[in-house]
UniProtKB/Swiss-Prot annotation:
Processing of the precursor yields different active forms of 64, 67 and 82 kDa. Sequentially processing by MMP3 yields the 82 kDa matrix metalloproteinase-9. The conserved cysteine present in the cysteine-switch motif binds the catalytic zinc ion, thus inhibiting the enzyme. The dissociation of the cysteine from the zinc ion upon the activation-peptide release activates the enzyme. It is linked to Intervertebral disc disease: A common musculo-skeletal disorder caused by degeneration of intervertebral disks of the lumbar spine. It results in low-back pain and unilateral leg pain. Metaphyseal anadysplasia 2: A bone development disorder characterized by skeletal anomalies that resolve spontaneously with age. Clinical characteristics are evident from the first months of life and include slight shortness of stature and a mild varus deformity of the legs. Patients attain a normal stature in adolescence and show improvement or complete resolution of varus deformity of the legs and rhizomelic micromelia. It catalyses: Cleavage of gelatin types I and V and collagen types IV and V. Residues 1-19 form the signal peptide. Belongs to the peptidase M10A family. The keyword Metal-binding applies. InterPro entries: FN_type2_dom, FN_type2_sf, Hemopexin-like_dom, Hemopexin-like_dom_sf, Hemopexin-like_repeat, Hemopexin_CS, Kringle-like, M10A_MMP. Its cofactor is Zn(2+); Ca(2+). Residues 225-273, 283-331, 342-390 form the Fibronectin type-II domain. Inhibited by histatin-3 1/24 (histatin-5). Inhibited by ECM1. This is Matrix metalloproteinase-9. A motif (Cysteine switch) lies at residues 97-104.
Amino acid sequence: MSLWQPLVLVLLVLGCCFAAPRQRQSTLVLFPGDLRTNLTDRQLAEEYLYRYGYTRVAEMRGESKSLGPALLLLQKQLSLPETGELDSATLKAMRTPRCGVPDLGRFQTFEGDLKWHHHNITYWIQNYSEDLPRAVIDDAFARAFALWSAVTPLTFTRVYSRDADIVIQFGVAEHGDGYPFDGKDGLLAHAFPPGPGIQGDAHFDDDELWSLGKGVVVPTRFGNADGAACHFPFIFEGRSYSACTTDGRSDGLPWCSTTANYDTDDRFGFCPSERLYTQDGNADGKPCQFPFIFQGQSYSACTTDGRSDGYRWCATTANYDRDKLFGFCPTRADSTVMGGNSAGELCVFPFTFLGKEYSTCTSEGRGDGRLWCATTSNFDSDKKWGFCPDQGYSLFLVAAHEFGHALGLDHSSVPEALMYPMYRFTEGPPLHKDDVNGIRHLYGPRPEPEPRPPTTTTPQPTAPPTVCPTGPPTVHPSERPTAGPTGPPSAGPTGPPTAGPSTATTVPLSPVDDACNVNIFDAIAEIGNQLYLFKDGKYWRFSEGRGSRPQGPFLIADKWPALPRKLDSVFEERLSKKLFFFSGRQVWVYTGASVLGPRRLDKLGLGADVAQVTGALRSGRGKMLLFSGRRLWRFDVKAQMVDPRSASEVDRMFPGVPLDTHDVFQYREKAYFCQDRFYWRVSSRSELNQVDQVGYVTYDILQCPED
């Protein structure tokens, strides 16, 4: 051995001993379903500059096609350092969530005036996001309009028809106007300048988490806070919580503080939970019973088994197979995940990740610092996950900005202005002097004396009086409320309530008008928990049960005055409670008393070769299958558009059913294909659609006597 070798070994050992210890690096994990952008900075800049009008303006000026001139335009418009370079400040601005209206130029498809020529502006809320209670959304829009009416002669009146000047819509991706949204973050909303038709309308990306800017809004029940919303984060026993918790309780009921510090304020309420109540179903809102038996198996949590629409449900007695009583489990915005591979599912706490147990959301395993959770108790084995809710975007502030566009304002270059294109949360007065000057340039000041902007508060859900525990640690089972709502909070109409069934005009009954004497119905649909049967301008209602008979007939025109006498198919989307009525090449959409339509089928993405829609079946959350003859398509209810790639032959998905059915509908979670007086019933077992019964509509479904 060389004389140098021992010395080298000694130096190596000493080097190891005296080297500074390395900082432990977090393990980075590739999460299944994680969407990552592969855009380079240059590609991001090119796309951004084109989308928001800078490239086109630079080219129109005859300037070079390098990014420099367009970057200078952007930097000047956004009040950034004017370097003409793709520097860090410019890239940061490009990555900031913002309005989708171009900064230079307008949505080029539309022409129109830059202001309204009347001062009483009407608006219609066409649909809602599920992120906030409807009352909170209504209030956010009303307060946003109030900002502009406080400094101008304008007034804003809510109406319930598409004739409104400003139609407000939540949508995702391509939502019908040719300017698609881009998923979560990025482009938040857009609006069109004043004018007829779609002009003046404001659209909000429903892939965002809409809040009041300070986290998800979770209304509480019971407790001692009079239904106030949860305050996130809150302190309990010295620890910070950003979601509802069961800590401190022995009954498993999730609760939250309604102030920033429970330890000092002692104010709390219970979060939505299937252990408190259920929604819809047939159990009058009673809470889930765990465990319960379904198809011979025991369940200790809400499940989607047995359903094709993805809704979580539970039995409200110990044995569903025997009692047939159930309800749908309420969702909690504070723990409903976004993205990942389990969007819409709930976080499960505690969960195991890399052998360690987590009782809150974590950023472990990620290089971007985003909080996530598992949606099963063990990520290591199941690999199911999603991002935890963040602070969300203030619907009030974004709406106020978009309504500025709907009134005729362009983007401002003042970073503190409401009309600056980038989202900025503030709890101070939103309007800057630049905003006020701009809107008054169009409409003038409010007539003197000019009142102060009205002070409004967000309405909070009320809770029924109850004997409440003095704090979250415990509650006696007998004190736990069992009465729940008969339907989900979001199930209300977007307009004035429609007249109840008892007010519908009953047509004088004759033997020919008895539903049991109708050979072929025009359309059949399950609406609510009843079966509706339509024929020649009339309809009947049927509730299943021993000795039940169809009620009616009633006039279609009394309940849905916009509809024609002859209908081809009808369906209800359960989540939004929208009713879709198809007749020939047209469709009408009712939301409460409000109606949209008639619209042509091509607006839904169905070609001119589709003469009618003959039926619909649920196909996952917010999705339907639309039928016409031998073909079917997958239909996105929220976007109101079919996926053209989903076209398929009926007999490929539903072997054994007639190919010339005149009506397809869903009833009690099974599919019915009608031909003449008969139906073919299809049930799904092991992901296979199989005909399990053939029968008469009148005798076997409506329980009509056979004499």
